[in-house]
């Protein structure tokens, strides 16, 4: 599983550099990374928490290096800029026992990923064929996830005792995350 996570990183960087991000290969690799993150987390293949977000930011940043971004995306740059005071404020409001670095990185990685994604996608045109390719790239790790759940999840009658979600039927991982990613697929 760690090899799979490493392969996504290495192949994604190689693929974007080789193609010089034409036609929006960074978006394709970002979609694949988002979809594969739950599978990687379930099997222990991530190196850090929020590995998928870091891959998305890396791939889209590489894509912006090759194909640029719209200069009119000022509102998204302002969004990223205004995240700085939130980091300062969060350090003041955290209690003494909290690991400040971990708390800040965990809470700020989502908005930063959203801002970078918005800057990359702003005024970027996609053909219908390219969109189908991105959806396909997003769907492939979901097939792997469904196969894993089919073989790993126990008999439902043995573990379901009520209407609450449980970790056993979701392959030993967070039921909300697994349900969300399968719902997107």
List each language-model region with its residue ranges:
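Plant-biased detector of terminal regions, especially N-terminal secretory signal peptides
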Residues: 81-83, 117-122
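Alpha-helical membrane-inserting segments
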Residues: 36-40, 121, 148
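Hydrophobic core segments of transmembrane alpha-helices in multi-pass, intramembrane catalytic enzymes
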Residues: 4-12, 50-60, 102-118, 176-185
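Alpha-helical transmembrane segments of multi-pass inner-membrane proteins
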Residues: 113-120, 129-161, 171-185
């Amino acid at each position: 599983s760690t090899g799979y996570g490493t392969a996504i990183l290495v192949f994604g960087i190689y693929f974007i550099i080789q193609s010089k991000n034409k036609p929006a290969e960074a978006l394709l690799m970002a979609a694949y990374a988002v979809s594969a993150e739950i599978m990687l987390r379930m099997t222990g293949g991530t190196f850090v928490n929020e590995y998928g977000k870091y891959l998305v930011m890396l791939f889209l940043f590489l894509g912006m290096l090759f194909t640029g971004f719209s200069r009119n995306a000022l509102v998204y740059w302002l969004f990223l800029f205004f995240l700085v005071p939130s980091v300062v404020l969060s350090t003041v409001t955290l209690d003494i026992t909290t690991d400040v670095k971990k708390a800040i990185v965990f809470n700020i990685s989502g908005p930063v990923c959203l801002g970078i994604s918005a800057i990359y996608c702003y005024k970027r045109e996609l053909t219908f064929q390219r969109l189908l390719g991105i959806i396909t790239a997003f769907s492939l790790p979901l097939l792997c996830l469904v196969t894993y759940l089919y073989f790993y999840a126990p008999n439902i009658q043995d573990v379901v005792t009520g209407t609450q979600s449980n970790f056993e039927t979701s392959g030993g991982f967070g039921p909300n995350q697994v349900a969300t990613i399968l719902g997107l697929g």
